[in-house]
Amino acid sequence: MKQTITHNKPRRAISYIRFSTPKQEHGFSLARQLQGTRDFCRRHNLVLDETLTIKDLGKSGFNGKNADSGNLSVFLDAIRNKKIPQNTVLVVEALDRLTRNNVIDASHLLTDILRHGIDVGLVTENKIYSKEYINNNPFEFIVATTYLIRGGDESRV
């Protein structure tokens, strides 16, 4: 009997790190997010491409500037132009690192990323959102939406 050996090639991961104020650069936010991403990638057998770490340091996610004119916007253009392979995982500490915009724009950002075949890994939740996962588990989208609402609400306070 012939035995077939399959190799599961680890998926590529790209880290997105953001904090809102330049003052936070002198704290532990950057180091915490980087270490969390590395640990997450180890747990999920992802290969972290540290040459493509996306950073919006001192850029608020509240009004969407990070997605409109920050380094996140460069990533979004790259996925729309198919320069980032599908099945890549964008790893963020939490959804509020990705955006703190209003819920409509925030959910649009998340679904835009997923629709382009890029999965979103959440360090704090230890889960990976994919288009397939969300479609098969629609209540997870409701959970994600509550995180997006909370992130926006925290910025408005």
Question: Predicted regions: what is each one?
Answer:
Residues M1-V157:
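Short, structured surface patches at the beginning of a domain
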